[in-house]
């Protein structure tokens, strides 16, 4: 029995601003421990017994491709990274994964996992995965419902029906329910047959494709067309951009799962019947970490219920989350607050209002401010740069190029650049000349001059770049060669 882990990494996590941003969302962040949420998701399946485990498959937006590839490399977990040219929700993403997994006539069991969830009890998770694999192997579509701990209004619910198989705890899916109001959620908790919708699924690749053919043939056709026009590109699998842009947007639940629940009474010998939908209860410390209050709930706390990370001082505080990326945070006599510091933004919010952080991000976008979408520190396939200072006609950046990293051969129409090597060795191409710079050496790149920066060494290259000119935007780059295919 071959299980193909499929990690869906398309979310933006705007409610965890300012740490999570559009160009560097929460699944890429190490919010709990040293691993990012994506790395923790991949690591969660390690050691599942009774099956063969395929290398991970990640479906993601093109903007995240290099960071995800690097995070998998650091784990020693090379896998397939399927790139969506544009976001089309989870049903098309899973359909692309099923098509990728079906290459060479394979038909593995897909273990579908959002990249940005937390599961504390990995052993409990692996136990239900083994149960789900046995049912999925027989043709069922399996989802895992979280045993509710409170009348939560922020999650959708699954109502479980009749028992499906023994000794498994699996039950037929009776129906899917949208996020309820508080009174309805309280009644669900008392009734006992309702589970939180986790977004975790298992099914054979062929079963999912057949279900899409029955429920959303338009999505299946668009994905098949995009897949047929695709190509391998280093670590990545690209699909046809225009074909995928024509694909309708829909979620796994709306496209297939709700229809499966509605036809639960259809006879199995009816050739038009959809696969059986099954839900298995999961109690494993699950959270979708959808907002700051949810993160506070899963992080270790002191005796006063506080979470403090980074340079933080708390005096007479209760139930407060304080996270610092650099500068000192000092809180005195506060309760139920979220305080988050980054290089370019500070958030202060009451824990009861963390769902409204998204409104701040929306306001930043309307005002055209970059803080809503990008961090001051920006990651590139060759390393990173940090915007240290900026003013009229100048900008200062701290550039770090990883060992072996090579920037594109490029030129700028509107700016000149001064480069100062802080540590490491730089290989410089400037016009027709190539030379090396060491620590405390510098060079000047005139406006309009073709240039390239490389790190030929085995340690990171750190530089200070001072840009000057009439326009300093990142779109003033004309690339002539690029080893990363940008």
Q: Could you tell me what each predicted segment is?
A:
Residues 1-7, 14-25, 30-114, 118-124, ...:
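Conserved N-terminal catalytic core of the sugar/cofactor nucleotidyltransferase
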Residues 38, 97, 116, 158, ...:
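Residue-level signal for inorganic ion chemistry
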